[in-house]
């Protein structure tokens, strides 16, 4: 498989750590919507890198977006704002999380559990950009 550029987003801080590690170990490049050095406000919101650094990973070639959700909630969390941007950019969405109460269910192209996140991202990219 070709090296993928994967935009990893988290419903809650830390949700995507294991998924990002798996992707990097498989040779893929991981991108984030947020800079770890930018603190969140009390509600959990923090500005994305487009606001703090003047560029967005989606301005470059992102092959697939991965949303890691560890909890069931019908409302998007502050860290999931990038899902909207990825949908608008036409990037395939893979979700590591349960479909129950998922506010993004209609836009998810592939759903997976943590153990198969690499394969799901590769399959989503191949389906979107393959021959």
Which residues make up each language-model segment?
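A short, Lys/Arg-enriched amphipathic alpha-helix followed by its capping loop at the start of a domain
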Residues: 18-28
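Ser/Thr/Gly-rich flexible loops in soluble cytosolic domains mediating phosphotransfer, phosphorylation
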Residues: 85-126, 130
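Glycine-rich, highly charged phosphate/nucleotide-binding loops
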Residues: 42-61
């Amino acid at each position: 498989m070709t090296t993928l550029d994967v935009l990893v987003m988290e419903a809650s801080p830390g949700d995507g750590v294991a998924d990002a590690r798996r992707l990097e170990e498989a040779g893929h490049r991981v991108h984030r919507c947020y800079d770890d050095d930018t603190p969140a406000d009390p509600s959990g919101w923090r500005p994305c890198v487009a606001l703090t650094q003047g560029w967005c990973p989606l301005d470059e070639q992102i092959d697939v977006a991965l949303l890691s959700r560890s909890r069931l909630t019908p409302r998007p969390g502050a860290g999931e704002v990038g899902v909207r941007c990825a949908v608008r950019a036409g990037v395939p969405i893979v979700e590591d999380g349960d479909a129950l109460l998922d506010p993004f269910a209609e836009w998810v192209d592939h759903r997976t559990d943590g153990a198969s996140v690499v394969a799901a991202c590769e399959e989503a990219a191949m389906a979107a950009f393959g021959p």
